[in-house]
A protein has these predicted regions:
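Hydrophobic alpha-helical membrane-insertion segments
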Residues: 19, 96, 102-112, 173-184
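Aromatic- and glycine-rich beta-strand/loop motifs that create alpha-glucan
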Residues: 1-25
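Transmembrane helix segments
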Residues: 27, 38, 164-184
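Secretory targeting signals
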Residues: 35-37, 44, 48-52, 56, ...
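Transmembrane helix-loop junction
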Residues: 10, 14, 76, 89, ...
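Helix-loop-helix units of permease transmembrane domains in multi-pass membrane transporters
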Residues: 73-105
Length: 184
């Protein structure tokens, strides 16, 4: 268990030590908020519930975020030669894979966390802007589904990263695989 936690925190800290994490967080929040705002200002979006519009806009951008997060998981380790070093340490392969999975999923959830704050703001201003009633159950279940879909997409991205050596190839294959899973 200690090895798993060590790998998990190593992955998570490696992500947050670079400014990329903070840039991803700001860009993801800005893009999903702008997409949602454009969707609710159009007449076509008024035909469906507000929660559907919100979670559709998040899901589309989540595929790109998952691709960016997962492309480096194992492809970078293979390219730099640190995977062999990691395999010589007394850890099991399952601990390595689960630690990297937990690190990537934690990072993804932390990057998407500001969207939850946006949800609270939408709930707060919806009576003022006359956006209609927001169902709390739909918001809660939508958030849970978003976490579950994120978990699935990170698992697919981890698999693709395991199969490739190059990060760019991993990103392209991950993007195609993620959309293949979502469209299936």
């Amino acid at each position: 268990m200690r090895n798993f936690l060590t790998i998990w925190f190593r992955e998570l800290s490696a992500c947050f030590l670079s400014p990329v994490a903070y840039v991803l967080m700001v860009v993801f929040l800005a893009v999903t908020s702008a997409t949602f705002l454009l969707d609710i200002t159009q007449d076509a979006a008024l035909d469906q519930p507000l929660t559907v519009t919100l979670f559709e806009s998040i899901l589309v951008w989540l595929t790109i975020l998952v691709t960016v997060v997962c492309m480096r998981l194992f492809a970078e380790e293979k390219r730099s030669g640190t995977l062999e070093t990691l395999m010589t340490v007394p850890v099991t392969e399952a601990q390595i894979v689960l630690g990297k999975y937990a690190g990537a999923l934690s990072f993804l959830l932390l990057v998407t966390f500001p969207v939850a704050i946006t949800l609270l703001l939408v709930v707060a201003v919806s009576p003022v802007l006359q956006l209609g009633d927001l169902d709390g159950g739909a918001l809660l279940s939508g958030g849970l589904i978003l976490i579950l879909v994120s978990s699935l997409l990170v698992a697919v991205g981890l698999l693709v990263s395991l199969l490739t050596r190059n990060q760019i190839i991993a990103a392209i294959c991950c993007f195609c695989a993620v959309w293949g899973v979502l469209l299936f």
